[in-house]
Amino acid sequence: MKKMLTLLLSAGLVASIFGVMPAAAAPTVVNSTIVVPKGTTYDGQGKTFVANPSTLGDGSQAENQKPVFRLEAGATLKNVIIGAPAADGVHCYGSCNISNVVWEDVGEDALTLKSSGTVNITGGAAYKAYDKVFQMNASGTINIKNFRADDIGKLVRQNGGTSYAVNMTLDNSNISNVKDSIMRTDSSVSQGKITNTRYSKVPTLFKGFASGKTSQSGNTQY
């Protein structure tokens, strides 16, 4: 009975994100990274994609795994479920837009910014991230809105020991069961802002930011 309830709740979450109840279908196994060209949109139509662990990676914390999706500058990824194994999730080479993407079991990372730009994440969710969900390996901005995350290490992490500027914003989201912090940096010039967000079991919202570089308003702890 408990297992059935869990399945029903999971199906309800997917339905609420994509607007329809998905038909039962085997996940698409990705053998080589799917490249979304510059300025184009990839619409997964609610399908589930998993990495071939032999070619992309097993979704562990091992370094140098390959992404399931690679987005070139200005590309958009939407209506996608990334299952397990997720390898290294999504790589953005410059600005990218992520809409209604769900990571069921985050691999090495859910998404990494590899070249400077702005990452806009709207809707979607991420679960079971042993370490971080979104990794910023280049200067830029990450805007997260209407997002759900649970059982994670950190939501956003700037690459450790780097000093470039990253602007992080989180709005109207729900974050729970965090091991470390929602936003973390080692840079004295990076900024973090959290607004209108519900959170539970979060040790600290911000970590490593310089004085005056963080702000919050309208948030609720539950």
Swiss-Prot record:
SUPFAM superfamilies attached to this UniProt entry: Pectin lyase-like (SSF51126)
EC code: 4.2.2.2, 4.2.2.10
Chief location category: secreted
pH dependence: Optimum pH is 10. Is stable for 1 hour at 40 degrees Celsius in the pH range 4.0-8.0.
Regulation: Strongly inhibited by Ba(2+). To a lesser extent, is also inhibited by Sn(2+), Mg(2+) and Ag(+). Inhibited by EDTA in vitro.
Catalytic activity, reaction form: Eliminative cleavage of (1->4)-alpha-D-galacturonan to give oligosaccharides with 4-deoxy-alpha-D-galact-4-enuronosyl groups at their non-reducing ends; Eliminative cleavage of (1->4)-alpha-D-galacturonan methyl ester to give oligosaccharides with 4-deoxy-6-O-methyl-alpha-D-galact-4-enuronosyl groups at their non-reducing ends
Keyword Cell membrane in record: no
Signal peptide (residue range): 1-25
Reported cofactor(s): Ca(2+)
Annotated Gene Ontology cellular component terms: extracellular region
Pathway: Glycan metabolism; pectin degradation; 2-dehydro-3-deoxy-D-gluconate from pectin: step 2/5
Protein location: Secreted
Chain's role: Catalyzes the depolymerization of both polygalacturonate and pectins of methyl esterification degree from 22 to 89%, with an endo mode of action. In contrast to the majority of pectate lyases, displays high activity on highly methylated pectins. Is not able to cleave trigalacturonate. Does not degrade xylans and carboxymethylcellulose (CMC).
Family: Belongs to the polysaccharide lyase 3 family.
Name of the featured protein: Pectate lyase A
Native species: Paenibacillus barcinonensis
Lineage of origin: Bacteria, Bacillati, Bacillota, Bacilli, Bacillales
